[in-house]
Amino acid sequence: LGFVQSDVMSYAYDGTNLFEGMPITNFSTVAALYMEQVQIVTCNPDIKTVADLKGKTVSIGAAGSGVFYNALDILGAYGLDYETDINAQYQDFGDSADALQDGKIDAAFVVAGAPTVAITTLATSKGAYLVSLVDEHIAALQETSPYYSKYVIPEGTYEGVPETTTVAVSAVIIARDDVDENDVYNIVSTIFENADSLAHDKAKELDLDFAAGVTNVPYHPGAARYFAEKGYEVPTK
């Protein structure tokens, strides 16, 4: 079993981006769990839109990471090239947060479920805020990368940060194809039959419609059996 972002899962299955020419197809979807939002965080008041990132120092995640490709997708939707239009920095979440705190970068791409602790801290201590995407560019992004969903981060998620429109990918459980069908069935059943007793904040986002909504990688037979019992037909190999 493993936990992945839906976009990275698609890269692996299709042999694209960081898996270019090396497809991995011996796994299946178990369930989608919750959304992980692409959050563009900045403390620079001159940055109002993604277009304003041109000429700025921007952390776009570790090279080859899921965040890196999310950043490239969004920059590309706005006609920006990460090699020529921005001063790209390749930092993970923690280093990006530290660099924003110290004023060493202008903005950072963070892909994680909101609220994210690092952004909460920056919003409180530095007045950081999030950059919104506009519908026109979201639509262009979804044409080439259908695993993105439009997502609105509500006002109040972070102190002083207004409602922000962005895109999100899914956090997904996957399993090797050779994992026993009954074991996978029991895992999915245990999660969704006991969702009300789960302590993590993200548990409130568990939803069968969402869990059964993955289309880019087929479902494991054990998961498909559980969803069929609940009235959902999902693709299998």
Predicted regions span which residues?
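Short, glycine-/small- and polar/acidic-enriched structural segments
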Residues: 1-54, 62
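Stable alpha-helical elements in mature extracytoplasmic
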Residues: 5, 9, 26, 49, ...
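Pocket-lining segment of extracytoplasmic ligand-binding domains
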Residues: 6-8, 15-17, 82-174
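Solvent-exposed loop/turn segments at secondary-structure junctions
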Residues: 7-11, 36-37, 46-48, 60, ...
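Extracytoplasmic
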Residues: 24-27, 35-37, 55, 83, ...
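Bilobed "Venus flytrap"/periplasmic-binding protein-like clamshell domains
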Residues: 35-102, 213-222
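Ligand-binding clefts/hinges and TM-proximal coupling segments of bilobed small-molecule sensing domains
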Residues: 56-57, 63-73, 147-218
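An extracytoplasmic/periplasmic, membrane-proximal ligand-sensing/linker region
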Residues: 95, 102, 112-125, 130, ...
